[in-house]
């Protein structure tokens, strides 16, 4: 015999498929729904199970709407009297439309059913018996006639039954009805009483917990705790914070020992950098981190370029490194990480930050220039950080190079060469031609071996931000130096006051990496904002904790900033009152990287001009946008863009609102311009200085553009931003500004003597061949 499906067996048993599935699962038969198949043996088990009396019945239907298929279930009810059972069957037949009802008794039966609350509200389990018993009672005489000879004893007995059934019917009257008006009894199990749970022996609490929090900890209802506190003389609600004394009083009354839980400040990431956090058993050797320092143009970037075999300098404006770069090179299987700090005085803070995360400092000194101001600053930073110094005497290939003079000058700063009995390593090199570079690398590895540098690669990564910027397509891009542990893609991370998850990790060669060990520089994306250069970063165990820590740090930083900017004391009260007469320059700084923005802001704030000071209204990374222009218009500020350009919309808005936007690629030019503007507030005196002359050799007329002069510079130089005079036959016929200055279709800032160029003059097109164009600038006469 083939297997049978559940719904087929349900039809045979006259049972719902759902009940058959439930019964099969109770018997251990593996079926899931009505389409499941069962064997012949399982079929017999189910048939046997459904032959037993059913204790749980379905909700009753109206007596007039009972289907014939439910008759077998009705016959299984417990019988009390044979006569009542016969009457039940007769009543069921009448409810099924059989028509076999005594016409003489119909009126009295309907009357009894109406008096007893109506058959429509009767429960299925008692509908047949109660209906027939009511018909046999003494309600209104109809049944008395039918039971004439038994009015005495049977009437009293049946009246008692009717009272019980009447009460049941009244209760059922208010039962909910189904879709077709059928009565439904609740099949939901009764709510079990709450299981009693013992009180804990110790109550761990934190100050500020409320009643609801304590109720969860001690497994009690909040109302019970509120009542107990009321009895102890403390009136609270369940959401009210409780102080330490109240919590301890409550715990003592319950017989528990109160124990205050020390809260860990998740926003404090500096604790992860403590030496005590390191496990001595898992420490291994790590690569050294080397910082290259020195005066501007002494060859730091050229040295690093030689080490990396790339042209870093060619991409730098003015030959000066604009932001910290981190690179790693491999020497005979031993990696070395290099940090290239800018050499200009404006980058003092960045250089100090570089020294704080480095292991070895290479001090680059030009053999022809000797010790310069930034050289001394670099020495002081390295000594303050306790970092060993290796002196690289550069440019020994140049005529006039005097390495001995450099050694003599540095000895005044306690950097005495080993050849003179000191401890400082000196290496004479030529970064341009790669002379003695191998010897310098050997010295670095030697010093690193002596320093015995260790790190734990197994812990969660910690480190420092080298640089950060806002990329148009990638969002915040951050260069990190891993100091301890291993940084992996996907790690939840907190960087300064920002947070996120490491989405993409790229090494210094532009290749994607999945992990980065100690002393490895990488560039990551995935942060919610641009951090500050020099911020520390920590990897957290989960993203939720990292987010909470980052948001808390950002909140604290904002509150601290507001407190600093709004704080007034008796010491500065007089100065604050005088600020009404104080002239100031409001400046908004936008730069390509955070380090440059910081350096420019620090330099501008150091400008000391009597009666005038610089106020940095806003400093950020990224292109100059409409929000910056709106802020500048509201605060009457000048926008300085460093290596960034304004968006087209921002440029249009700036023109409409007459906001001054100054764009620069060299940092000291920006400082110089602001300083000049500040001194202008003091009504300085200027004098004219002729920079050069050029002779017009050809003219080109371009429609909708104007006249372009093809000229040859005969004296000095002509700058794009200088003023010009057009001289014809010794007479000045026009004075104005250059509209453009080009060489070979490229815009240039200046053209020197002996070179040809193309020039356009603003609002002047009457240029003739052999005209002389004289360039001049207005120089300020320095005031003492």
Curated annotation (Swiss-Prot):
The keyword Lipid metabolism does not apply. Residues 173-182 have a biased composition (Basic residues). Residues 285-454 form the tr-type G domain. The gene is infB. Residues 106-172 have a biased composition (Low complexity). Pfam families: EF-G_D2 (PF22042), GTP_EFTU (PF00009), IF-2 (PF11987), IF2_N (PF04760). Residues 31-198 are annotated as: Disordered. One of the essential components for the initiation of protein synthesis. Protects formylmethionyl-tRNA from spontaneous hydrolysis and promotes its binding to the 30S ribosomal subunits. Also involved in the hydrolysis of GTP during the formation of the 70S ribosomal complex. This is Translation initiation factor IF-2. Keywords: Cytoplasm, GTP-binding, Initiation factor, Nucleotide-binding, Protein biosynthesis. PROSITE patterns: G_TR_2, IF2. It is found in: Cytoplasm. It comes from Enterococcus faecium. NCBIfam families: IF-2, small_GTP. Residues 56-69, 93-105 have a biased composition (Polar residues). Residues 430-432 are annotated as: G5. It comes from the Bacteria. GO terms for molecular function: GTP binding; GTPase activity; translation initiation factor activity. Residues 340-343 are annotated as: G3. Residues 294-301 are annotated as: G1. GO terms for cellular component: cytosol. Residues 319-323 are annotated as: G2.
């Amino acid at each position: 015999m083939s297997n049978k499906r559940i719904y087929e067996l349900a039809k045979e048993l006259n049972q719902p498929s759902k009940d058959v599935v439930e019964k099969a699962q109770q018997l251990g038969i593996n079926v899931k729904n009505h389409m499941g198949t069962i064997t012949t043996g399982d079929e017999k088990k189910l048939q046997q199970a459904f032959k037993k009396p059913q204790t749980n019945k379905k909700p009753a239907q109206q007596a007039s709407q009972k289907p014939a298929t439910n008759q077998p279930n009705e016959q299984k009810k417990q019988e009390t009297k044979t006569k009542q059972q016969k009457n039940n069957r007769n009543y069921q037949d009448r409810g099924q439309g059989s028509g076999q009802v005594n016409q003489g008794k119909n009126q009295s039966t309907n009357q009894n059913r109406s008096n007893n609350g109506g058959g429509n509200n009767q429960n299925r389990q008692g509908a047949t018996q109660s209906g027939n018993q009511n018909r046999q009672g003494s309600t209104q005489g109809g049944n008395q006639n039918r039971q004439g000879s038994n009015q005495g004893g049977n009437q009293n007995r049946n009246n008692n039954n009717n009272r019980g059934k009447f009460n049941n019917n009244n209760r059922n009257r208010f039962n909910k009805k189904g879709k077709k008006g059928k009565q439904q009894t609740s099949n939901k199990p009764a709510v079990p009483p709450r299981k009693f749970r013992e009180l804990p022996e110790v109550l761990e609490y934190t100050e500020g917990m409320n009643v609801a929090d304590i109720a969860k900890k001690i497994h009690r209802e909040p109302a019970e705790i509120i009542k107990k506190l009321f009895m102890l003389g403390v009136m609270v609600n369940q959401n009210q914070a409780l102080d330490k004394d109240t919590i301890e009083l409550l715990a003592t009354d319950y017989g528990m020992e109160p124990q205050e839980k020390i809260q860990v400040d998740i926003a404090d990431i500096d604790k992860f950098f403590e030496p005590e956090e390191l496990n001595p058993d898992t420490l291994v050797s790590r690569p050294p981190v080397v910082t290259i320092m020195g005066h501007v143009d002494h060859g730091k970037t050229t040295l690093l370029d030689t080490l990396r075999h790339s042209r870093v300098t060619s991409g730098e404006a003015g030959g000066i490194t604009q932001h910290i770069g981190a690179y790693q090179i491999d020497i005979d299987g031993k990696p070395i990480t290099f940090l290239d700090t800018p050499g200009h005085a404006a980058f003092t803070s960045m250089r100090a930050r570089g020294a704080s995360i480095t292991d070895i400092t290479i001090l680059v000194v030009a053999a022809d220039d000797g010790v310069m101001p930034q050289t001394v600053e670099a020495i002081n930073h390295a000594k303050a950080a306790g970092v060993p110094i290796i002196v690289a005497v550069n440019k020994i290939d140049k005529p006039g190079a005097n390495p001995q003079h450099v050694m003599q000058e540095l000895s005044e700063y306690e950097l005495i060469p080993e050849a003179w009995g000191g401890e400082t390593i000196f290496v004479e090199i030529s970064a341009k031609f790669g002379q003695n570079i191998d010897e310098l690398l050997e010295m670095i590895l030697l010093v690193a071996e002596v320093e015995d540098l260790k790190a734990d690669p197994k812990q969660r990564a910690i480190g420092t931000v080298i640089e950060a910027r806002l990329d148009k397509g990638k969002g915040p891009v951050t260069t990190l130096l891993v100091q301890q542990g291993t940084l992996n893609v996907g790690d939840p991370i907190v960087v300064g006051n920002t947070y996120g998850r490491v989405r993409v990790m790229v090494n210094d060669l532009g290749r994607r990496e999945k992990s980065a060990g100690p002393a490895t520089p990488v560039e990551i994306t995935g942060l919610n904002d641009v951090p500050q250069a020099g911020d520390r970063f920590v990897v957290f165990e989960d993203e939720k904790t990292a987010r909470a820590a980052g948001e808390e740090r950002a909140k604290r930083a904002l509150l601290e900033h507001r407190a600093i900017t709004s704080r007034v004391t008796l010491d500065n009260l007089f100065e604050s009152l005088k600020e009404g007469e104080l002239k100031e320059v409001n400046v908004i700084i936008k730069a390509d990287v955070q380090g440059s923005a910081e350096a420019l802001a620090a330099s501008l704030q150091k400008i000391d001009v009597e009666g005038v000071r610089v106020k940095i209204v806003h400093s950020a990374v990224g292109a100059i946008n409409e929000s910056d222009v709106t802020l500048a218009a509201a605060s009457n500020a000048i926008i300085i863009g460093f290596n960034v350009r304004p968006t087209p919309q921002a440029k249009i808005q700036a023109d409409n609102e007459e906001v001054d936007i100054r764009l620069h690629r060299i940092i000291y030019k920006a400082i110089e311009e602001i300083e000049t503007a500040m001194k202008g507030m003091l009504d300085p005196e200027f004098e004219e200085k002729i920079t050069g002359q050029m002779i017009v050799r050809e003219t080109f007329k371009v429609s909708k553009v104007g006249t372009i002069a093809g000229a040859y510079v005969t004296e000095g130089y002509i700058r794009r931003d200088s003023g010009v005079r057009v001289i014809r036959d010794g007479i000045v016929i026009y004075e104005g500004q250059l509209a453009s200055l080009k060489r070979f279709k490229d815009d240039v800032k200046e053209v020197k003597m002996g070179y040809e160029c193309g020039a356009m003059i603003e609002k002047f097109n009457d240029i003739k061949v052999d005209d002389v164009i004289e360039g001049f600038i207005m120089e300020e006469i320095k005031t003492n």
